[in-house]
Amino acid sequence: MTTARYCLLLSSLLCFSLLPVALLAEEAVMLEGEALTRVVPGSFYFEGRIGPTQMRNAAAVRFGEKRHIIAALVDTSGYSSDIRAKYEGFFITDSRITFGDKELAAGAYGFGVTKESKFNIFDVGGNLLLSVAGAKDSATRTPRPLALLKEDGGVRMYRGRSFV
C-alpha cells in the first residue's frame, strides 16, 4: 500500500469515527417567540378530534439545524371525560430519542401524566405506546404547567413538578 493510500484510508476512518461524536455534540437550543410559533402546530389530532394548542403552555428545543422536540398542552374541553383523563397534550420528535429509559421513534404522539408522575405516550389513535416513571421536583416553588429544560446534558420534560 502506498503512503498516499494509507494516509487517505487513515483520514477516512478518522472522519467517520468522529461523525457520531459530532452528532451527539449538537447543542440544545430552547426556542422562544417567533421561532417557537413557527414549529408548534396550532392544533393537534387525537382519537378522532382536533384540540387547539395552548401556546402559553408550549415548548420546543432544536438540536442542530433540523432536529426538534416539541411539546404542548392542548385544550381538551371538547373531548370525552375518558380521553381527558389520559390525554393532556402532544409530544413531537423528528428523530429517535430516549424518553426516560425507553426509546421513542420519530413521530407525533399524545401524552398524559398520572398523579404518580408516570408519563404515558400514546399514538394518535389513543393506544398506549410506552409508560415511563417520572420523578418529582419538590424544590421548584412555582412550577409551569409544561416546560422543556436543558438538564444534565439532555432535555427534561416537566409537567408541573413531575419530570422525565
Indicate residue ranges for each PLM-predicted region.
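Short, intrinsically disordered, low-complexity terminal segments
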Residues: M1, L19-A25
